[in-house]
């Protein structure tokens, strides 16, 4: 195995040329489809907003709630309001701190029992009740009043009404508790404004929520997602489209800590899957009669972890075609796509979650004991040398790593995550991209590479070159084992699984080839 970083530098230099070609090639956007997607989901957004506003009034009475405000959402969802934010942050140790030269989240306060946690919450936050609002007579419901000068004439300046705190209404409490009454489960649920209201946290409450609360949570999660999709992907894409209907994202090798590629203007790395938001449908071929071909590596990071850890159980499961994401989904009772994040959590040393998730994480650690052992070795390596080294020669430095009383180390997640993500997407995928570009040129094909996303490669296929493009992409993606030996001095012995899909656009595609390796 290589001990130097030269092979990874050479790979990066070769990849730079390929990425330059991909940027120049760009992707073709069907603007009619993009516009129809925008119109459809803007309508859904309006309908969701009306539903949510009506329900907020039902849950809160006349108390105004701004769903864009983390503090207001915390009040709405948890029915409590923090009385002293500074003391709250201090008691639960919320915020960031410098560890070496890096800002990291503070380690949260550890309570002896859940009862102690609730006692602390109740001492620093007050319950919220539904309200009845009446017009503030001081400002006549405007929230501001006209300041009178000393000579008795009205000023042109309107001042904030302190009587109603600029709300225009005066509120009196009813006897009924307001909000959705979610119950925080541990200190991780706490935030600077009260309690967390992100998608992952809210989804974790769905299984125990009443029908009424469940419906509201689902609608809010959908509302938040659509807003993000419209702003980030539709609006971002529309701004980036050139006169010829193309977008040319910029690809960068030096932004992420792991070496994984990132892109901007617009960002194509976090493009939503079709079952959540169909923006991929507007990505079509630039060629009349052309197709879009995508090649995906199957469970690449899971297989890479098994290879780096020399975990025999991973190799056995891969050879027996065990779908680890489906296995996770069955245990947790969620979709395969949603299960992916839970599959990867123990892969990177994750231990926190719902009781069901934590049970799965423990089962994962026991089943894949080779990965568990390897995690300990990585931590020890980081402690001894302040760095970890991949067989490719790539190195990650952790100058301020320390042993914790729990037996773990600081930067534990990064120490376990970086080698897997880095080797998979910074050391292996570029090999396939470079080989693919060389093969397309050698075979004089007009088909071009137009995108790459983490562990996949996207081609714009010239008419009548479909079969040649499939064969060429398959050959490039399956070349990892021999190429690793040639470039890095070792053989990648884990079976390489790939799946190829072809379609008229990047969303509506049919499988044309699949191999487990």
Name every feature range the model reports, one short phrase each.
Residues 2-4, 22-23, 27-35, 215, ...:
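Glycine- and acidic
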Residues 36-71, 364-373, 464-517:
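Polymerase palm active-site segment centered on the conserved acidic dipeptide of motif C
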Residues 78, 304-307, 508-514:
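Short conserved micro-motifs at the rims of enzyme active sites and ligand-binding pockets
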Residues 25-28, 43, 59, 83-84, ...:
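Secondary-structure transition/capping motifs at alpha-helix termini
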Residues 249-335:
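Function-dense linear segments that define catalytic or interfacial modules
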Residues 17-20, 24, 131-161, 165-170, ...:
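Conserved catalytic core of nucleic-acid polymerases
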Residues 297, 455-457, 498-500:
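A structural signal for short, well-ordered beta-strand segments
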Residues 1-274, 289, 358, 362-363, ...:
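Conserved "right-hand" nucleotidyltransferase catalytic core of DNA-directed polymerases
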């Amino acid at each position: 195995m290589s001990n130097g970083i030269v092979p990874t530098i050479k790979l990066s230099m070769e990849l730079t040329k390929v990425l330059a070609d991909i940027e120049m090639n760009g992707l073709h956007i069907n603007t009619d489809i993009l516009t129809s997607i925008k119109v459809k989901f803007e309508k859904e957004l309006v309908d969701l907003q009306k539903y949510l506003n009506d329900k907020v009034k039902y849950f809160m009475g006349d108390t105004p709630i701004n769903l864009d405000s983390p503090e207001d959402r915390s009040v709405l969802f948890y029915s409590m309001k923090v009385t002293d934010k500074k003391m709250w942050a201090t008691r639960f140790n919320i915020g960031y701190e410098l560890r070496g030269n890096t800002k990291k989240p503070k380690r949260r306060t550890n309570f002896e029992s859940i009862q102690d946690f609730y006692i602390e919450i109740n001492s620093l936050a007050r319950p919220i009740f539904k309200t009845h609002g009446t017009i503030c007579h001081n400002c006549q419901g405007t929230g501001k009043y006209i300041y009178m000068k000393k000579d008795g004439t009205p000023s042109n300046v309107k001042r904030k009404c302190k009587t109603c705190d600029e709300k225009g209404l005066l509120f009196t409490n009813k006897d009924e508790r307001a909000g959705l009454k979610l119950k925080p489960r541990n200190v991780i649920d706490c935030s600077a404004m009260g309690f967390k209201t992100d998608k992952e946290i809210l989804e974790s409450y769905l299984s125990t929520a009443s029908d009424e609360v469940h419906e509201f949570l689902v609608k809010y999660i959908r509302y938040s997602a659509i807003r993000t999709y419209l702003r980030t992907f539709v609006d971002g894409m529309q701004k980036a489209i050139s006169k010829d209907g193309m977008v040319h994202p910029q690809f960068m090798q030096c932004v992420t800590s792991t070496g994984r590629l990132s892109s901007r203007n617009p960002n194509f790395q976090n493009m939503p899957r079709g079952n959540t938001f169909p923006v991929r449908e507007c990505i079509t071929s630039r060629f009349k009669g052309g197709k879009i071909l995508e090649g995906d590596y199957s469970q690449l990071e899971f297989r890479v972890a098994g290879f780096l850890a020399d975990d025999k159980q991973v190799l056995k499961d891969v050879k027996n075609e065990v779908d680890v994401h489906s296995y996770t989904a069955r245990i947790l009772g969620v979709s395969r796509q949603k299960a992916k994040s839970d599959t990867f959590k123990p892969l990177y040393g994750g231990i926190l979650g719902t009781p069901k998730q934590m049970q799965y994480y423990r089962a994962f650690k026991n089943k894949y004991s080779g990965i568990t052992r390897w995690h300990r070795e990585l931590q020890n390596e980081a402690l001894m040398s302040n760095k970890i080294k991949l067989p490719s020669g790539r190195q990650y430095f952790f100058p301020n790593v320390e042993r914790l009383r729990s037996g773990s180390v600081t930067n534990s997640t990064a120490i376990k995550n970086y080698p897997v993500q880095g080797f998979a997407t910074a050391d292996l995928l570029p090999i396939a991209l470079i080989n693919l570009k060389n093969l397309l040129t050698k075979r004089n094909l007009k088909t071009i590479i137009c995108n790459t996303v983490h562990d996949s490669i996207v081609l714009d296929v010239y008419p009548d070159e479909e079969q040649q493009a499939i064969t060429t992409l398959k050959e490039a993606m399956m070349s990892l084992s021999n190429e690793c030996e040639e470039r890095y001095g070792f053989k990648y012995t884990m079976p390489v699984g790939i799946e190829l899909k072809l379609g008229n656009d990047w969303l509506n595609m049919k499988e044309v080839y699949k191999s487990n390796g």
